Amino acid sequence: MTRSDWLIGGDRRTAAAERIYAAATDLIARDGMDALDIDALASQVHCSRATIYRCAGGKRQIRDAVMERSAARIVEAVRSAVDGLSGSQRIVAAISVALREIRSDPLGQLMFSTIRGGQNRTWLTESPIVTRLATDLNGLADGDTEAVQWIVRVVLSLLYWPVADAATEQKMVERFISPAFAS
């Protein structure tokens, strides 16, 4: 029986990178972000370390790509949920859906379960990517950085210190977020 070569046909580099990222996602979800190991990844993908480095980069690039793919899925779900909404209704929906999607995503769960008090996680609040996505998803005007930063911090706070149940959280978001963005 002949085994098919997953690197034959099409764009080999893209095929290899996608396979590497999928395996890295599984390993990271299982073992944690800091436990990503190139040898284990190469074994999982059935390729050499050189193929990993050539097609996907080092650990940092692979972790970034895995997180980017996870974020893209979350962003698409939020974007779909807020389509056609505006103002405070859009912002409340965006926050609620983002919280639900991050919590249901294995990498989202992992990221927030490993954050401990006192750690420097300013990259979450200062990231231009996070700022751009928050601006876009919430329908805010470009340049309203204070509103964007506040929304990002609200979401992070609710992820880090969750409310007892979803209904209470939804009431809190509606009660305190909606008036802040009422026209």
Summary of predicted features, one role per range:
Residues 1-44, 61-64, 69:
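Basic, helix-initiating cap at the start of DNA-binding domains
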Residues 1-4, 131-149, 154-183:
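C-terminal peripheral helix-coil segments that are non-catalytic and often amphipathic
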Residues 19, 40, 69, 89-97, ...:
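Amphipathic alpha-helical interaction segments
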Residues 23-30, 73, 77-84, 154-162:
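Solvent-exposed, amphipathic alpha-helical segments
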Residues 45-56:
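Short hydrophobic/aromatic patch on the recognition helix
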Residues 61, 65-68, 78-104:
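Hydrophobic alpha-helical connector segments
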Residues 75, 110, 116-149:
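Amphipathic alpha-helical packing segments from all-alpha helical-bundle domains
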